[in-house]
Amino acid sequence: GKLDKFFGNNGSISSLTIVAPMVYNDSLVSVSIMRSVDVFDINSGIKQFGISVHGERNFSGGAPWGGAALDKTKEIVYIVTGNPLPSLYGVNRPGENKNTSSIVAFDLKKRNILWAFQDVNHDLWDYDIASPPIIHNLEIEGKLFETVIALTKTGNVILLDRNNGKPIFDLRYRKAPISDVPNEIT
């Protein structure tokens, strides 16, 4: 194809993404490493709105770089997020570091976060979710589940109800070993 000079700024938009954009109705959905989902008019390139992955926070990082999936019927974008920064040192970012190392669902119609599921709280091990989310209708024992699936660096398969972010199966969290780093809380 040819560059459309009337789209955005002489044929391009600034989105800082490494994830392929998705077409949604008359819009282009871009997942930005600046920690947001941005929606642009597909004809003009004008930004219609953006939804931030993180509100107020005490950390950096958590960028959605691993991939995204769009459920056009439900008008929901699912993303996976990176770990908080600095990656291996969390003294200056206490707490869970919400929405990092997570699967996050964005409601494009309501323009907000629908739900988030955090795989690793206060990630100190670079265990962010690096594989794109997969949307799949899965039949288990005769019952159909609308799921979003993500594979993790720890070898886990996260299987969630894509409507509410609840796990399909029971899961068990484990406490991390106590850190040897002064003032670090695991």
Give residue spans per PLM region:
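Aromatic (tryptophan-biased) beta-strands that constitute blades/sheets of beta-rich domains
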Residues: 2-14, 46-57, 112-121, 166-186
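Phosphate/diphosphate-binding loops
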Residues: 132-183
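Extended hydrophobic/aromatic segments used for targeting, binding, or gating
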Residues: 100-107, 112-116, 120-125, 133, ...
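Acidic, glycine-rich active-site loops and adjacent beta-strand->loop/helix elements
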Residues: 54-55, 83-84, 120-121, 152-155
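Short, solvent-exposed loop/turn and secondary-structure capping segments
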Residues: 8, 41-43, 50-52, 80-82, ...
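Beta-propeller blade signature
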Residues: 1, 36-45, 96-111, 157-165
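Repeat-blade elements of multi-bladed beta-propeller folds
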Residues: 16-37, 60-92, 102, 127-152
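Mobile, glycine-rich extracellular loop/lid and propeptide segments
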Residues: 1-6, 10-42, 51, 159-160
